[in-house]
């Protein structure tokens, strides 16, 4: 079931470095929120904070609140593994397990949870591949290695793997940056379908992509080199691209910088 994410006064640090300052925003269920901004502005850092992936970096810490519905994912006693199960991640480059079969790639997360029933695994593999619009392309070669698929197919395989564990939220970090235009179109069409079931947050440098796939857009920027990234503005995507409140947003959208 899709859930809402709320960030309140979030500050992100790596050791003594203040990476992102004072971010407050609401990410609505069954919608796509795009995070945009120049390189180094903190948008990917914010994305990784939403499921505690940044914690793999030594010295990383977060101040403020990140709520999944009403549950603070940083509260004492909250298991990061459980958070990452509820809030899945699709990375910039497709990262299937190359020697593992297509079927086993999809159900890898379920197996880690201890699921061994073959029918459950097979049914989940099929439903997830259908959900990722990949089933018809691979149904006759499920036992072939996932690494043998094209780049676009591999990314959809990674999306199938993410939704197999039934998350509430899907995070996507520039999911089309390494793909050709045809594969990019397939992923964008898939995102539009997936938002009917999931809350989706996507980081993208492609302004046209943000305009096409998202319902709301958040623009991040840096005050200066060495200063923390900040949320400049968040609004409906239509407003951000047609009549933003902040000049910095307009300048970035129009290509004057970034």
UniProtKB/Swiss-Prot annotation:
Residues 5-247 form the ABC transporter domain. ATP binds at residues 37-44. Keywords: ATP-binding, Cell membrane, Membrane, Nucleotide-binding, Phosphate transport, Translocase, Transport. CDD domains: ABC_PstB_phosphate_transporter. It catalyses: phosphate(out) + ATP + H2O = ADP + 2 phosphate(in) + H(+). GO terms for biological process: phosphate ion transmembrane transport. The keyword Amino-acid biosynthesis does not apply. It is found in: Cell membrane. Its EC number is 7.3.2.1. GO terms for cellular component: plasma membrane. Gene3D superfamilies: P-loop containing nucleotide triphosphate hydrolases (3.40.50.300). SUPFAM superfamilies: P-loop containing nucleoside triphosphate hydrolases. It is a peripheral membrane protein. One of its GO terms (molecular function) is ATPase-coupled phosphate ion transmembrane transporter activity. The keyword Cell membrane applies. Disulfide bonds: none annotated. Pfam families: ABC_tran. Part of the ABC transporter complex PstSACB involved in phosphate import. Responsible for energy coupling to the transport system. Belongs to the ABC transporter superfamily. Phosphate importer (TC 3.A.1.7) family. NCBIfam families: 3a0107s01c2. The complex is composed of two ATP-binding proteins (PstB), two transmembrane proteins (PstC and PstA) and a solute-binding protein (PstS). This is Phosphate import ATP-binding protein PstB 1. It comes from Mycobacterium bovis (strain ATCC BAA-935 / AF2122/97). The lineage of its organism: Bacteria, Bacillati, Actinomycetota, Actinomycetes, Mycobacteriales.
């Amino acid at each position: 079931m899709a859930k809402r994410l709320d960030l309140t006064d979030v500050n992100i640090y790596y050791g003594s470095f203040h990476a992102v300052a004072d971010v407050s925003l609401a990410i609505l269920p069954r919608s796509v929120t795009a995070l945009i901004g120049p390189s180094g502005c903190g948008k990917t850092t914010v994305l990784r904070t939403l499921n505690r992936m940044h914690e793999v970096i030594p010295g990383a810490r977060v101040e403020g609140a990140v709520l999944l519905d009403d549950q603070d994912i940083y509260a004492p006693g909250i298991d990061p593994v459980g958070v990452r199960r509820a809030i899945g991640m699709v990375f910039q480059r497709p990262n299937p397990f190359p020697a593992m079969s297509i079927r086993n790639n999809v159900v890898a997360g379920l197996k880690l949870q201890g699921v061994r029933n073959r029918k459950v695994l097979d049914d989940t593999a099929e439903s997830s591949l259908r959900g990722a619009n990949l089933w018809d392309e691979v149904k006759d070669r499920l036992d072939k290695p996932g690494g043998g698929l094209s780049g676009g197919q591999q990314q959809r395989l990674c999306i199938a793997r993410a939704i197999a564990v039934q998350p509430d939220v899907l995070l996507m970090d520039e999911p089309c940056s390494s793909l050709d235009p045809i594969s990019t179109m397939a992923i964008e069409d898939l995102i539009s379908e997936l938002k009917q079931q999931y809350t989706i947050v996507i980081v993208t440098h492609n302004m046209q992509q943000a305009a096409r796939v998202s319902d709301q857009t958040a623009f991040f920027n840096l005050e200066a080199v060495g200063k923390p990234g900040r949320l400049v503005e968040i609004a409906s995507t239509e407003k951000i691209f047609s009549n933003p409140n902040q000049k910095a947003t307009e300048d970035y959208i129009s290509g004057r910088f970034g």
